[in-house]
Amino acid sequence: MERSHVVFLSLQDRPPRPIAAPERAVLCLGNFDGVHVAHRALLRAGVRSARAGGCPCGVFCFYRPSSDYFPALPAPEAAYASGTHLCSLSEKLARFAEEGVDFVWLCSFSAVRDIPAGDFPELLRTGCGCQGVVCGFNYRYGAGGAGTAAMLAAAFSCPSDVPPVVLPEMRLADGTVSSSRIRAALRSGDPRLAAALSGRAYSLEGCVVAGRHLGHRLGFPTANLYFPAGRLIPAHGVYAARVYTPDGVFPGVSNVGVRPTVDGSAHPRPNCETYVIGFSGNLYGRSIRVDFLEYLRPEQKFSDLDALRAAIARDAERAAELVLPE
């Protein structure tokens, strides 16, 4: 594999900085989209194995999820269609660091997709002196996904290796914990289930952009965020939210969707408009995070702006009751 396709980053620094490949390591392997509760259990197991083996713990993953390389072709009207990503790469790295992971080995999926499964363990050994692996029960690798978790564990079962760890299926709320189940919950308007499986609320973080200032004229000024390309957009509708601003944490009411009452364009771009309850400052150009806590109602088109104003007032009142202080 060409070195141009590879980067090692220390997670002990903020922001993460490039480092040389470690001489010895235990590696956690997976896509880790969303870094949900099962992922975090895997990462903690990797950190324990690495500490017992006297070496650093790293994560081997891709710049972009492998699913990105097998996309369905969108229809023309899907220019702003929802993606599948549950978090950004920077959010993913921060969550790795929270669990005590020392470094991440990022590579391009295209650089390894055709490597035979039998050659993959040697790639890990030569790449960073990998002496132990930790993965989930359903981990696949190698060309065509021919390699299994059991095969990888067998390849790292030499006496000189740190014992391999394969984590079994984790179940929660009557089902398997998985990124695909979290996506399904968000698309169906169930942020509570998504949060239970993730261990945190689904969120959107970004720089507030200027809108049409209609919310201000209605008496409910909003902070507007766009979903990055590839990011999963939850079910369109109104949410009770918790909003993290540079000036503190506030309850909020967020509309995710296309603003049908005021936007008559053929293919409007979905966004997130949040009325921050109890906040009176200016957030334009500042970074905020919106946690989606409770789905209140579907997005709808109102007959006039007075009806829209009344609905926002009701939504804000309900959100203020639901969003408790941290």
Features from the language model and the residues they span:
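Positively charged, low-complexity intrinsically disordered leader regions
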Residues: 1-29
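Di-metal (Zn2+ and/or Mg2+/Mn2+) metal-binding site signature of metallo-dependent hydrolases
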Residues: 28-47
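Residue-level signal for inorganic ion chemistry
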Residues: 36, 96, 133, 194, ...
